[in-house]
Amino acid sequence: MKVSKVASIVVFALVLQTTLIPYLVGSWVPLDLVLVAIVYLAMTTSPVTALLSGAAGGVIQDTLSGGIIGVSGIAKTIVGFSVALVGTQIIVVRSFPRFVIFFGATLLHASVFLGLYSMLVAPIPNSSVSSVFGEALGNGLVGAVLFELLRALPRLRWRGMSGSRIKPRLEW
């Protein structure tokens, strides 16, 4: 994957996370679209790309969210690299195993994130078990659905002009 494509995926996730998601889902489903983007990149690219995109996305998210700068960057770096290493050993082609990977990556991210905050003796944000599992469930569902949509996107071909309409055709 080219650097511009990786950067655009991370920036798009950051923009959605900070602008659109708070208005669409509110506070009842905590989603981390940056983490979803990092895990997607980790499953489709190399471990080095996942490591660098996790570090960049996490530090930018820390800067925008007002937390301790670097904590989310370290957590997302560890998650991205770990998922990429697992992805090089295991081929995942079905939706449910992808959901499990997104779910497990969110749990790993939460444990590293909360562990770093507890070592820094800072007030731990969003530390209840139900909120962590809610975020893992939300990220798992969103990640699995987005992975399938992005996988099916190149198969969408435009058939041609019939009158003034363009008819899309999905090839399954």
Question: Model-found features: residue ranges?
Answer:
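Terminal, non-globular segments
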Residues: 1-172
